[in-house]
């Protein structure tokens, strides 16, 4: 496949988005969000997410990400009395966790801090080290907090949902609304946002029509939301995220192909999971548990995914690169301009785009 040299430059993935286009609250019901349906060759249709029911066919397989978002944003008080914030990312063993810290320069190795409850310092923690590649801090939590499941009771007491910084209001409803209906495995620090559109009613209607569903797990972290800063994308590296592909999912994909169905990814995290694991095994999907850091950008050959339901992504993000790999950078940016003009809502609580297999640029 020939690659336009501009596809390898980060600046080629920039676009101007009016602040009014950034969704601040989700729509109700979930499936009421707008859906930009991409047409083959050229053009698009403005519909709603519920209309995805008309686009999918009996025998198709929807692959969703079943990760559950942790209440991973914690307020801390420093020894000098000032407040700070931690975003809990990944376990490092023995109750030690990699966290993003703010203000980072005020949290130094050896510092004692305390989690805040009801405005007062409560549970003591220790800053152990600086993690150079992410700029994060290694924090000592209670030693029993070795994984997301054992840390979650602490987060439920002290933490809040880690909404993105472009969402300026937050309340108790986010605890349910910033989770998918199928979230089951704790570990993410951001939602797999395309899945937020799939209501229980829509999922039931899809099942009744004969559309299958299977789950993959990718615990969304730095690899998804960290800004890309490398202009030369041939040098781009992403942080690893933990992925699990089960034997049941591998069998579901194989059965879908055998019956002539289409493998449809719900969200870019599902794409990264499926393609990342396949890439580790010569293009063949196999059961897997472990870190994945695959970069998907124009020129990438998809081995598993044929169609995609996705949200509208930030300029110059790795997610924009991924979607461009499927339908082409220039066409994607044209579709984004249509969405802006037509008043679509962008980012995590925003609207969605449907890219059917016949719109893929894959050979």
UniProtKB/Swiss-Prot annotation:
The protein's annotated pathway: tRNA modification; tRNA-queuosine biosynthesis
Keyword Disulfide bond carried by entry: no
Biological process, per Gene Ontology: queuosine biosynthetic process; tRNA wobble guanine modification
Location of the protein in the cell: Cytoplasm
Catalytic activity: 7-aminomethyl-7-carbaguanosine(34) in tRNA + S-adenosyl-L-methionine = epoxyqueuosine(34) in tRNA + adenine + L-methionine + 2 H(+)
GO CC list: cytoplasm
InterPro entries in the cross-refs: QueA (IPR003699), QueA_dom1 (IPR042118), QueA_dom2 (IPR042119), QueA_sf (IPR036100)
Enzyme Commission number(s) of this protein: 2.4.99.17
Keywords noted in UniProt: Cytoplasm, Queuosine biosynthesis, S-adenosyl-L-methionine, Transferase
GO MF annotation terms: S-adenosylmethionine:tRNA ribosyltransferase-isomerase activity
Sequence similarity: Belongs to the QueA family.
HAMAP family, per the entry: QueA (MF_00113)
Quaternary context: Monomer.
Purpose: Transfers and isomerizes the ribose moiety from AdoMet to the 7-aminomethyl group of 7-deazaguanine (preQ1-tRNA) to give epoxyqueuosine (oQ-tRNA).
PANTHER family linked: S-ADENOSYLMETHIONINE:TRNA RIBOSYLTRANSFERASE-ISOMERASE
Protein name from the UniProt record: S-adenosylmethionine:tRNA ribosyltransferase-isomerase
Gene: queA
């Amino acid at each position: 496949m020939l690659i336009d040299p501009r596809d390898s430059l980060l600046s080629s993935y920039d676009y101007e988005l009016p602040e009014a286009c950034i969704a601040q609250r989700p729509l109700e019901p979930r499936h009421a969000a707008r859906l930009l349906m991409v047409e083959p060759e050229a053009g698009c249709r403005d519909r709603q997410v519920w209309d995805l029911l008309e686009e999918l066919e009996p025998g198709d397989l929807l692959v969703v990400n079943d990760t559950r978002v942790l209440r991973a944003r914690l307020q801390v008080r420093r020894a000098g009395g000032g407040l700070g914030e931690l975003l809990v990312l990944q376990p490092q063993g023995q109750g030690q966790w990699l966290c993003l810290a703010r203000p980072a320069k005020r949290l130094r190795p050896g510092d004692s801090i305390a989690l805040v409850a009801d405005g007062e310092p409560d549970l003591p923690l220790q800053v152990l080290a600086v993690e150079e590649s992410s700029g994060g801090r290694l924090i000592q939590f209670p030693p029993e907090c070795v994984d997301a499941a054992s840390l979650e009771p602490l987060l439920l007491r002290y933490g809040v949902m880690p909404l993105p910084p472009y969402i300026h209001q937050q309340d108790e409803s986010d605890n349910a609304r910033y989770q998918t209906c199928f979230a089951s495995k704790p570990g993410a620090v951001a939602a797999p946002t395309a899945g937020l559109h799939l209501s229980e009613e829509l999922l039931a209607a899809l099942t009744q029509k004969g559309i299958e569903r299977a789950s993959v797990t990718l615990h969304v972290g730095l690899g998804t939301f960290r800004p890309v800063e490398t202009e030369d994308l041939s040098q781009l590296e992403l942080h690893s995220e933990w992925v699990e592909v089960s034997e049941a999912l591998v069998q579901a994909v194989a059965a879908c192909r055998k019956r002539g169905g289409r493998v449809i990814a719900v969200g870019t995290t599902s794409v990264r999971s499926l393609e990342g694991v396949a890439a580790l095994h010569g293009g063949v999907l196999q059961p897997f548990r472990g870190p994945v850091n695959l970069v998907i950008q124009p020129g990438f050959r998809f081995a598993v995914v044929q169609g995609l339901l996705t949200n509208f992504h930030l300029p110059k993000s790795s997610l924009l690169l991924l979607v461009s790999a499927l339908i082409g950078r220039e066409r994607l940016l044209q579709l984004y301009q249509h969405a802006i003009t037509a008043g679509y809502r962008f980012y995590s609580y925003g609207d969605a785009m449907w890219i059917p297999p016949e719109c893929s640029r894959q050979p």
